[in-house]
Amino acid sequence: KYVKLGNAKAIYESLSLKSDKIEAYYNETENSSMDIANVIAKKNVVIEDKKMKIVGGNFAEYNVKKDYFKVNGSKLQLTSQMNILRSNNRMEYWRSKGVAVATGGAEAQKENEFIVKADRLVWNLHEINKKITVKKIIGFSNVSIRSNNEVAFSDKGIYNNITEVCKLFGNVRLQRGDSFLTGEYAEVDLKSGISKILPAPKKGPNESKVRALIEKETKE
């Protein structure tokens, strides 16, 4: 075990971890060398990785083998390019898988274009020119998306950053001014401002894999 106090900092590849206290735990290998297994950070946690930044953490744990971060705090914020992800409870980040998850009062914002809220939000990330950007946003439970001219509600939502279309599933309600539409599935085009209630499509395999990943890590 290694402990550092006061403006502590740990660096691993492109990843940087800062906090008031850092504890590193080692595993002894067959050739008697020591490999870092877990890193724990306490108070004023700041995590940076290729222009992506997480702040507001009171406690963070990094599993080196899984390349997985778990951060706790009441005012967590992840910033990547023009996008912001917030949580009042927990944030998780799988570096190698390109997935970030906010649980508890989750909120995703893209400048002044829209705000998505849900009990749990998932960011699918990808790297372009050594910068991490948001490819897709998935919301679970009590989902709402607010744009400049409309508010939409559903049980689940999937936003594609490339097409700028948000797909809403289950108990959908679209509200614009005093008028509203209801249904089980809708597509909200945030670029054109056009929203449609449509027949529900079949469940996509990518969303199933993301949910399985989240549930597996949550149980461990």
Task: Map each language-model feature to its residues.
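Mature-chain termini and adjacent capping regions
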Residues: 1-220
